Amino acid sequence: MRNPLLDRGSPAELADRGQVIDKKVELGTFARLTEAVATDLSSLATEHIPQKWRQAPVAIRLAFGWADDGRRFPTAEGRVAAHVPAVCQRCLGPLELNLDVDLKLLLAGPDQVAHATGDYELWEIDEATIRPLDILEEALIMAMPLSAMHGPGESCDTPGETVPTESADTVRPFADLRSRISGPAGDMEPDESE
C-alpha cells in the first residue's frame, strides 16, 4: 500500500487528484524534526527524557486543490498537530510543546511568485515534485519556538531562584573572622596561638 505522505508528485498532479491526507503518524516519521528534538533532549538527565517520545502521535489533515478556476495555482490546506518534548530554556527542565499549525499554502514555483494572489501563504517550490511529508515537517519546525519555556502558571524553577539548603558539612573558612575583628577601626586582635 502506498503512503501518500511519502509519494512524490507535482503540485498540479496532487491538486488535479484532489489528494486528501487525513491520518495519524508517529513523530519519528519526521526525520529532521526528530533530530532537532533529540539534540535538545540530550541536555536532560536520562530519567527526565520522556519514554517513547518518538512514538507520539501527529495528527495530519492536508487537502490539495486549486486557488483559481484557471488551474494555475495549486494549493495545500489543512492542519498538523503534535505534542513535542523540549527543554525549558528558563529552568532547563523538561516540557511539552503543543504545536498546532493551520496551513493555507499556495504552492508556486519561482516563475509564479509574482503572480500569486489570494489569502494564501506563499510556499515556494524549488523542484518539480514535492513530498507532502516535507511540507508538514517544515511547518512543524517553523512552529517551534526559538526559546522554549514553561508558560505562565506552570511549574518552572529558574536556576538561582531556589535557595540551596545549608549542609552541615559546609566549610566556612571566614566564619571566625568577625569574632577576630575588634573596635570601630577594625583592628585585628592578634591570635593568641601565635
Predicted regions and their residues:
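Structured interface patches
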Residues: 1-194
